[in-house]
């Protein structure tokens, strides 16, 4: 749930109106409660930035437990790839990107044209090191001299945009870099020891530690937190199930736990 994000330095900014969506697919019998049952059932598909994978799983379970008949599915990928999939014809009910840049791109596409977006949470980039710190990387400046493998997201992915900006700001050229498509791939590389260091989010660091992987970390104080805007697609805007899920996401204490 969203409080798990806050615990890892994601903060709910909660304002405005963001909505989710889905195709309502439940059939009800002719009982007195059938109308209410139909209104609260259906499917909701959310395209979400890869760094939200742990929170999304918790949200799915919590909402479905409280709303039998509703099927919420989060699809995780790098934000840029999600926008590309939508451009190629995918029609999720809702999109949550890890930056405003990719959301702006999505809103230029027909499926999200005219959609309003709302920032749900923020996240923070951090430099992490593999267990035992084999690359002896204790500061950002150590990246200037290390021969260790450093994992970085592709530049068009939010985590990559932030990482490359930080490297450029400090005049750092990596000697031995590996480029990954999404932040969870970077986290996996470092967690498994296939990279000595990498740029991930504080949420990914928290998730690794929860799994018992003791990654080291180097704070990046001059990196601004990035925002996670959410928007409904045209498909989602017509879904009662999606709108109800969205309202729960914004207002429910359970969602914020």
Where are these regions (language model features)?
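Exported/periplasmic ABC-transporter solute-binding proteins
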Residues: 13-65, 80, 84-87, 99-100, ...
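Conserved beta-strand core positions
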Residues: 44, 70-72, 125
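Conserved phosphate/oxyanion-binding catalytic-loop motifs
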Residues: 103
């Amino acid at each position: 749930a969203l409080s798990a994000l806050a615990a890892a330095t994601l903060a709910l900014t909660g304002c405005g109106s963001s909505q989710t969506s889905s195709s309502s697919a439940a059939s009800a019998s002719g009982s007195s409660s059938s109308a209410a049952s139909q209104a609260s059932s259906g499917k909701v598909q959310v395209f979400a930035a890869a760094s939200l994978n742990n929170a999304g799983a918790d949200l799915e379970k919590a909402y479905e437990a409280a709303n039998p008949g509703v099927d919420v599915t989060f699809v995780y990928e790098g934000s840029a790839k999600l926008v590309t999939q939508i451009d190629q014809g995918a029609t999720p009910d809702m999109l949550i990107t890890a930056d405003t840049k990719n959301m702006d791109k999505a809103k230029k596409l027909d499926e999200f044209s005219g959609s309003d977006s709302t920032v749900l949470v923020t996240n923070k980039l951090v430099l992490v090191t593999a267990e035992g710190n084999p690359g002896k990387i204790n500061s950002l400046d150590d990246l200037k001299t290390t021969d260790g493998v450093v994992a970085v997201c592709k530049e068009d992915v939010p985590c990559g945009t932030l990482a490359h900006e930080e490297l450029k700001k400090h005049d750092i050229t990596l000697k031995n870099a590996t480029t990954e498509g999404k932040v969870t791939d970077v986290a996996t590389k470092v967690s498994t020891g296939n990279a000595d260091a990498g740029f991930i989010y504080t949420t990914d660091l928290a998730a690794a530690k929860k799994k018992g992987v003791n990654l080291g970390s180097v704070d990046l104080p001059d990196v601004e937190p990035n925002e996670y805007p959410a928007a409904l697609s045209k498909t989602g805007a017509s879904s009662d199930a999606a709108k109800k899920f969205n309202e729960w996401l914004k207002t429910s204490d359970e969602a914020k736990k």
